[in-house]
Amino acid sequence: MGQSKKLNKQPRSLSPLVLLSGISKSFDGKEVISQLDLTINNGEFLTLLGPSGCGKTTVLRLIAGLETVDAGHIMLDNQDITHVPAENRYVNTVFQSYALFPHMTVFENVAFGLRMQKTPAAEIAPRVTDALRMVQLEEFAQRKPHQLSGGQQQRVAIARAVVNKPRLLLLDESLSALDYKLRKQMQNELKALQRKLGITFVFVTHDQEEALTMSDRIVVMRNGVIEQDGTPREIYEEPKNLFVAGFIGEINRFDATVIERLDEQRVRASVEGRECNIYVNFAVEPGQKLNVLLRPEDLRVEEINDDNHIEGLIGYVRERNYKGMTLESVVELENGKMVMVSEFFNEDDPDFDHSLDQKMAISWVESWEVVLADEEHK
């Protein structure tokens, strides 16, 4: 997070494939999407991320043509598809349930869409075989869905979707039914498949780690509007507001009060009662309240014993959890605020594993913090 860790941002040269302009949608008088604008580029893996009820699945269904918009327009490849039926949109959807036909073999499931499109019979077998080969299920072609694992069923659903060569593939929480290990494996396979096919993927999930792992771009939604749109690293390291900061991973929020501006970048502030310099890229006034945000892994901790004096926020270890590569500690500051700290394991450091109630000093590298205006005192 913060100034010194920012990426060199590469210009996005991808051409737009889907344009959503001024999209609104209500159900039973309640607006679930409000004046939404979104561009989806050719060949990218875009994730719509947000809590349940934020409108992300509704956006997916509107693009697919499974719901109709109340206002606004949807363009696909420079064609207005706002009122085009779903079957004519060159868009395929993979649902959470996979929706495979239980009485059909894997081959017949994948071939179904081609037959519905009246594809010449001579083309069907090679195209289905190619699609199954891409998802490594060629030898399972004659099995029924109930004879497959959850991960294999998911790959059949993807093969059935890509065999039609859609311009756009929509995936609605399609990994959520898998166990943890298989889910991690499928995340890698899905991203590799997307790169191989060159098809634009739009993926819906509420799982932040999944979004960070798979996406070229993440759109964070809340209450039917977009809170932030950016690369995974931008979303994680440069959150635009407290909602995004808190929704993506663990984060610590410290209360700060401006003392004075030192220069164009730095402000002298009291952070939880400790004076320090913070990087602030917007106008502030003395006495103004701010939020200073730091990820657990961006904090430094040092044990305080009777014979040493260390600068920092003073607190006491209340919980400690060994996670293999990291040690995660909960430190209670002297004012009662709880702070999460994550340290990478170092077997050569005799002070690495802290005792409960150990007195600690918490600090961070200047400029690694993200500073936001206090939304309650605007």
From Swiss-Prot:
Domain ABC transporter span(s) in chain numbering: 18-248
Gene Ontology terms: cellular component: ATP-binding cassette (ABC) transporter complex
This protein's UniProt keywords: ATP-binding, Cell inner membrane, Cell membrane, Membrane, Nucleotide-binding, Translocase, Transport
Record membrane topology: Peripheral membrane protein
Positions contributing to ATP binding: 50-57
GO molecular function, one term: ABC-type putrescine transporter activity
Functional description taken from the UniProt entry: Part of the ABC transporter complex PotABCD involved in spermidine/putrescine import. Responsible for energy coupling to the transport system.
Reactions catalysed, as given in the entry: ATP + H2O + polyamine-[polyamine-binding protein]Side 1 = ADP + phosphate + polyamineSide 2 + [polyamine-binding protein]Side 1
Key word Translocase present: yes
Entry protein name: Spermidine/putrescine import ATP-binding protein PotA
